[in-house]
Amino acid sequence: VGLLAITSADRLNAGWTAAQRAREYGSPQAVSHVERLLADVPSWCALVTVIDGHPATLAWLGSVVGHRTRSLGVEHFGQTGTIADLYAHFGIDARGIVAAAQAIVPGRPIRHASFL
């Protein structure tokens, strides 16, 4: 299991887009920060992205190196409740994250998930 905390999806995506554009215009050595971060993650690994915002914000990460991706986030706005209740509703609590990880890699049990 790997964990990547992204503080600015916008800047990370802008760097990736700039590197792609540079390669298209003849700079094959251009590599973005996110490409360096994900370069050592085997292609058979899957990514689960989680954001307290729209899931499309991080869904592009699977395209960087070609990983299967399950993006979790808030798809409908206007609900009220406690943070814990809302996170559970949208599947961005611990139980939802583990369920998404289990679903994207079927047959590979997640150890120590019984605490949920």
Describe these PLM feature segments.
Residues 1-116:
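Thiamine diphosphate
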